[in-house]
A protein has these predicted regions:
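Peripheral, non-transmembrane regulatory/ligand-interaction domains of membrane transport proteins
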Residues: 1-149, 155-156, 169-172, 179, ...
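Long amphipathic alpha-helical coiled-coil segments
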Residues: 147-160, 184-196
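Hydrophobic alpha-helical transmembrane segments and their immediately adjacent juxtamembrane loops
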Residues: 168-263
Length: 263
């Protein structure tokens, strides 16, 4: 009873004297739901009785209810457990496909985007989603594996085989999530490297511009002092000669930095 009514539960399997306790968690797929929200499903299963407890509607159970209403649902306890596992694995595979699609879009945007400011929160959100899913994939894999390996007498061989396959499926989903987390980390590293490179390029450009204008400013400063003996001060062509010399100096500095690959 405590396991069925606990407010916060982790996926697990436990054997009791007259049945088994199976606790699973599913992603909340309802409209406007928080994608990080998880719904707990608590099942007490005996030879001829199933007691389920949940605080909110769960798609995996709703599908079974619809099938039973149409007289096409599971006909035994074993079939019910397999149906629950199939529905959960299917829903999680669809959610995982959506996460992969989001990551593909981020990678494509990273390769094309000039502005990467919007990519960082998208990657962070995707990683949080993947971590949340990964947190429950492996425990659910272990729960279904325990049912298949330590199965009660009322679970037949075919159901045990399907439960074992479901355990393997959750294991594959967990491996896929780990691969997604690895890809997301690589994408985040590429984004960080791109941002660092852009910052370095901007700093280098500003430094080169300052290096070009510093000697020009020094020369014009010398020519602007109010003392006698300034060259070309009395010449009508002095302004143009000085401007040409400064322009030539600026071009020479620009060519120097360009040849040194600073530009």
């Amino acid at each position: 009873v405590e396991g069925l009514l606990a407010p916060d539960t982790e996926p697990r399997y436990a054997e009791l004297d007259d049945g088994i306790l199976l606790i699973l968690r599913e992603v909340n797929t309802h409209e406007n739901a928080d994608p990080h929200d998880m719904i707990s499903l608590r099942l007490w299963v005996g030879p001829a009785r199933i007691i389920s407890a949940r605080l909110r509607h769960l798609a995996a159970i709703e599908d079974i209810k619809v099938a039973l209403a149409k007289k096409s649902g599971p006909g035994s306890v074993s079939e019910f457990l397999c149906a629950v596992g199939r529905n959960m694995a299917k829903e999680k595979a669809e959610i995982l496909a959506g996460v992969i699609e989001d990551l593909d879009e981020i990678d494509e945007d990273l390769a094309q985007a000039d502005d990467t400011k919007t990519l960082r929160p998208r990657i962070a959100k995707l990683r949080r989603r993947a971590i949340q899913l990964h947190r429950f994939f492996r425990p659910q894999r272990a729960a279904f594996a325990d049912i298949a390996e330590r199965r009660p007498a009322w679970i037949d061989d075919s159901a045990a085989d399907e439960l074992a396959e479901l355990s393997a499926e959750f294991g594959r989903l967990a491996a896929d999530i780990e691969a997604i987390l690895g890809r997301a980390q690589v994408t985040q590293d590429e984004l960080r490297s791109l941002e660092n490179q852009r910052a370095t390029d901007i700093t280098t450009t500003l430094t080169v511009v300052a290096a070009i204008f510093l000697p020009l400013g020094f020369v014009t400063g010398l020519l602007g002092i109010n003392v006698g003996g300034i060259p070309l001060a009395e010449s009508k062509a002095g302004f143009w000669v000085t401007s040409g010399a400064l322009l030539a100096l600026g071009i020479a500095l620009w060519l120097y930095f360009r040849n040194r690959r600073y530009l």
